[in-house]
Amino acid sequence: QDLVVSSWKERLIAERMHQKAAHIQQLLQQTNRHWEEVFWQLTARNFGLPQNSEVFEAVAKTISVTLLAKHKHQIHQLEALLLGQAGLLEQQFTDEYAVMLQKEYRYLKKKYQLHTIHGTLKFLRMRPSNFPTLRLAQLAMLVHQSSHLFSKVLEAGSVSQIKKMLNVTANDFWHTHYTLTEASPYRAKNLGTSMVNNLLINTIIPLLFEYAAEHGEQRVQQKAIEWLRQLPKENNRITRLWEESHTVHNNAHDSQALLYLKKNYCDAKRCLQCAVGNAILKRT
């Protein structure tokens, strides 16, 4: 049975990568196959987490990597661009930092003839560490501290190299703020291990896998899968259900396979098309 489960997990991961590839290919088409641009848009989407992913991706689509590169050395300008395009610099502010960002944004908006995104960002029922204001500030810092990120991902020899690149800390203002309007007790706002792992699992590894598939680079594909095995298993409601049923999962490769299995086979009642389901039915 372990052999059945093990080989089925490989198949599920392949299906999961194929599912992710559909969105990647759509973005490649929109960007004239610009991999760095797609990497930027998907990274921004991931920073938005499920609640704000659509708005974050829409914001990224209005700010090209070329425009980001022009302002990458000025963290305040990057924050102004991202927060402004997300519609978070529209109100009256009293805090001088927020006023400065608003002024910066108005200048950049006029200069580049930008159009603010009018999606609604969610703050309710979210941990302050996931507030869109803070996540956009961290995203700005990632742009500020790195360049040609996707090229660096392709060149990276280990998953720890990528983790080092990703683990940024937001600008000083954010150490005492989660939003632009309210101060909070001091806490350094670094991206954190779970968010870094989330980015690797949901954006970097699928994009790397798809790039390798398109360019016939099997070694890079294997590297992507190996990185998935090196990441810790995810901890959420569904993975805990699998644990309760004594299904072994040791790393992110396993948990991703099981998450995909639950959504696309168990929930869809496709037991007869599932290797595990078949094995169980044969025993009964």
Where are these regions (language model features)?
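Acidic, carboxylate-rich catalytic segments that either coordinate divalent cations
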Residues: 244-284
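Long, contiguous, compositionally biased segments that the model treats as domain-scale units
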Residues: 1-7
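Hydrophobic, aromatic-lined core segments that form the binding pocket/scaffold
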Residues: 12-255
